[in-house]
Amino acid sequence: MSTITSTNETNFVIDNDEVKGRQIISKRIYQCGELIFQEQPLVLAQFEWNKLYKYYACEYCLYPLESCEQNVRRLCQDSSIIIPHSECDPNRNIDQQIVRCPKCNEMYCSIICYQQAMNNYHLTLCQSNENQNKDQLIRHIIDLWRNVHPPPETTSISLVLKIMAMLKQSNNRLLLLQELQKFSQGVQSENQQFYHKLLRKEFESQVEQLRYALEQFNEQYMQIVEFKWFLTSNGFRQLLALLGRNQQGIGTSSLAIWVKNCEALSIPQQAVAAAVVTSDISQFIDAIYTKIDDISGEFIDCEGSGLFKLQSCCKFY
């Protein structure tokens, strides 16, 4: 049995199926490449190893916080590289645009993102040294996560921390909990069981350490009664399964933005741009990607994951 939920969109509806969970059902035929919808995530977080290795990105929206040249030089470990056609890089003056939290130095791409983060969760999670025990526990939780989830990464424990902080700061916890509850529909389906790799038996002790640390964080600093069940042994496993099943990957790159803008240039402009460094800009781009692959491998982008209310409905069975 399923129920249909109407949306503000005219081209699709949300079907709540008892077995498959939420699904988007189209009301018309779409053409290949056509945009169906756009949405902001309920919450997102950069991967912990990705952040540790200085893939600089906005803490709130994951927009890259390097110029293309800075990005390429870091990935290639070559400070002599000069990127042609700098006007194709919207991040060429990004150093002057970065907004930092005055207390913890966390970076944001704009004052808007900083204010949104503060309003939603950062007021709670800001590691300002005003409460060193709390800051130390947050770092301990993140370190535990890195120990059990090396690259290539698939999710981040910061998603859980942010959800807890959002509940702490929310004026309407019930509404936020209802939104989170929607993501859990179908997680325990007998016909479509999802197993997050952290739920494998060899990770049991590490998962328990994480759960206990988060439980202590809630008891000592959050005091979110409504979240206590998610920090029980069974509840925490369900929470990880919920994230693993519903999250969407997010990747951003100042190099990719520059390449896309270069491809949009007219042929004469491309020739001028390429002449700065090489006779053919496409060859220059290919050479850059080859060098990045040799030095940094597949780890090119600022990467993270997020929970999107609509995109999480787009599953393939």
Give the positions of each predicted feature.
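Short alpha-helical interaction motifs and adjacent low-complexity tails used for partner binding
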Residues: 1-317
